[in-house]
Amino acid sequence: MTALVRAELLKLRTIRTTWALVAVSLGIALVLLGLQLRNAGLAETASLGTTASTRAILVAPGSAALVILVLGVLVATGELRHRTIGATFLVTPARGRVLLAKLLTAGLAGLGLSALGLLVTLVIAVPWLAANGVTADVVNRELILVALVTLAAGPLYAMLGLALGALVRNQTVAVVLGLLWFLVGEGLIGAMGLRWLMPWLPGGASRALARDITLPGLLPAWAGGLLLLTYVVALAVPAWWLLQRADVE
């Protein structure tokens, strides 16, 4: 399994789209970080140095979750799109092991991207705050938990994208479906008077994991993470079943 994961990571590193997604993810985090630093203390925004403000800074990398979702789809569908999956199955006939290796690879990639975003955020934010005479307490229990769930969101979203891509098997369709669901679909469900259902959808689970205190009725953070993992399994199991029976070139 270790060799399979290493091979999948090597494939991922050699694709230019991967690095484009890394750049987009960091760009989103930096833009939101800049907005938070600029707007702190205005209107209803917490002042710099407060726990609420520092919390908003720490969750900035999590705003690129949909980019990480797309990265997971890329891991699942890259070989299908380029018609190289047949060679992979010749080397490793156990297709379930290949799917598991891709799932682990997506998780590692998502974790790495979340960690990179969080690191870049801290490297920029802490010196900037210090230069402006603001001392941010980033080591209290609440903020440590926020940092941890920001890290956890990356692998969960990447594995969710992987499972979706493995089930749909078409890269473009999987990306469009994933983005439409999070950007439009869940909002439509809420607009239809089914707001009670929102906490149990993937987006609601993500907000619960991020400890979004602005939205009422969300699950606890641990339950949100567990619910996201349940969605991963719910998509991965039928994807595995179909993969066992699929004809590949």
PLM ranges: what are they?
Residues 76-81, 114, 156-158, 171-172, ...:
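Transmembrane alpha-helices and adjacent helix-loop boundaries
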Residues 70-91, 96:
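Transmembrane helix boundary and interhelical loop/hinge segments in multi-pass membrane proteins
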Residues 227-249:
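Junction motif at the cytosolic side of a transmembrane helix
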Residues 31-34, 171-207:
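Transmembrane helix segments
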Residues 11, 77, 88-90, 161, ...:
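Helix-capping/transition residues at the boundaries of transmembrane alpha-helices
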Residues 18-74, 99-168, 207-230, 234:
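Secretory targeting signals
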Residues 1-26, 169:
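Aromatic- and glycine-rich beta-strand/loop motifs that create alpha-glucan
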Residues 17, 94-96, 170-172:
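Membrane-helix interface segments
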